[in-house]
């Protein structure tokens, strides 16, 4: 009887809410690499590293409800003389099923929540690469992907507004 009192719009919203789906189908390593350009010399100098972290995400739509999200994380560790001690790169990927979301919600999910799910796997893989390469463990801090997404959206909006203003 409650359904009889709802407007058609409310019924549509309730139906949409019942159809929203999110699932992790698979998490996998798409690519990884480790280089020690200095070779054994990296172990003969005092260990005072400068760590640089480069982060990027890529979203590939596979079909209507399936997306591949790839978190690309590159760590470059340099010594005091700016020589690279090691370079480690991981492309941690996930296959996600998503249905029933509007475009803004979908974009936020794929650009924020999915990379946040993938990050612990990438962090562990990078740590493992470093220690297997003979270096001390990497202790990468957590990343706030939601804040990064919001920042990127604000920046895109500002650029769009500037592009529309006459010079």
UniProtKB/Swiss-Prot annotation:
Entry-linked Pfam families: SecB
Source organism superkingdom: Bacteria
Gene3D superfamilies the record matches: SecB-like (3.10.420.10)
One GO term of the biological process aspect: protein folding
Swiss-Prot/TrEMBL keywords: Chaperone, Cytoplasm, Protein transport, Translocation, Transport
InterPro entries for the chain: SecB, SecB-like_sf
GO cellular component: cytoplasm
GO function term, MF aspect, one: unfolded protein binding
Localisation per UniProt entry: Cytoplasm
Subunit-level organization: Homotetramer, a dimer of dimers. One homotetramer interacts with 1 SecA dimer.
Similarity remark: Belongs to the SecB family.
PANTHER family (alphabetical): PROTEIN-EXPORT PROTEIN SECB, PTHR36918
Function summary: One of the proteins required for the normal export of preproteins out of the cell cytoplasm. It is a molecular chaperone that binds to a subset of precursor proteins, maintaining them in a translocation-competent state. It also specifically binds to its receptor SecA.
Protein name per Swiss-Prot or TrEMBL: Protein-export protein SecB
């Amino acid at each position: 009887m409650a359904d009889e009192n709802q407007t058609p719009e409310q019924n549509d919203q309730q139906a949409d809410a019942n159809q929203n789906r999110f699932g992790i189908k698979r998490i996998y390593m798409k690519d990884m690499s480790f280089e020690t350009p200095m070779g054994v010399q990296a172990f003969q100098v005092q260990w005072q590293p400068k760590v640089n972290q480069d982060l990027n995400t890529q979203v590939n739509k596979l079909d209507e409800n399936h997306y591949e999200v790839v978190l690309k994380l590159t760590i470059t560790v340099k010594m005091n003389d700016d020589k690279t001690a090691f370079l480690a790169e991981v492309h941690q990927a996930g296959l996600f099923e998503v249905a029933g979301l509007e475009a803004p919600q979908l974009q936020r999910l794929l650009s924020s929540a999915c990379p946040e799910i993938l990050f612990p796997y990438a962090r562990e893989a990078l740590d493992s690469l470093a220690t297997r390469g003979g270096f001390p463990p990497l202790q990468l801090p957590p990343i706030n992907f939601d804040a990064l997404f919001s920042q990127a959206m604000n920046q895109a909006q500002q650029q769009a507004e500037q592009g529309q203003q006459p010079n």
